[in-house]
Amino acid sequence: MTAQPTRLTTAQEYWLAVAAAVVTANAYYIHPIIGDVARHFGVGAAQIGLVPALNQLALALGILLLLPLGDRFSNRTLTILFTIGQCGGLIMMTLAQGLTLFTVGSTLLGFFTIAPYLLPAYASKRVAPERLGHVTAILTAGVIFGILVARV
């Protein structure tokens, strides 16, 4: 017999939404500052346009390749690992002296932006069935908030 997972408190549900917002926003912070990044690296619009394009392509690839792991492994563990992967991409972008390394870091960041898609599955096992729709809505709002705030 397996032990019942601990139920989430209302505060924990909202903190998961904040986490979803933060990890989602990481993939979108480049958009409002793309001109500044292009000037910093001394490149034109065509070259800098690859950065968000590859980030989003890597996100799609991450959804295709990494998200199914949530069916076999702990969503909590995967969320932690993928968030660490995001941090690695962010560190690479921060330390990049050239556009190539910056682009690789951004691509890794996109690839590991899977946590927002794992959090609803994690939460669904830890809330009462009658609260599932409400909690899913809170987490979805966190993802949308992250996308919108990152673009400001």
Which residues make up each language-model segment?
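Extracytoplasmic
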Residues: W15-A45, I63, P116
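Glycine/proline-centered helix-kink
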Residues: H31, I63, I138, V143, ...
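Structural signature of transmembrane alpha-helices in multi-pass secondary transporters
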Residues: V23-T24, P52-N55, L59, Q86, ...
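Residue-level signature of mid-helix packing/kink "hotspots" within the transmembrane helices
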Residues: Y28, Q56-L64, I114, I147-L148
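Conserved MFS/SLC helix-loop-helix module at the cytosolic interface between two early adjacent transmembrane helices
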Residues: L61-Q97
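Paired small-residue
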Residues: G89, T100-L108
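Cytoplasmic helix-loop-helix junction between adjacent transmembrane helices
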Residues: G105-A141
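Juxtamembrane helix-start elements in MFS-like secondary transporters
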Residues: G44-P52, T136
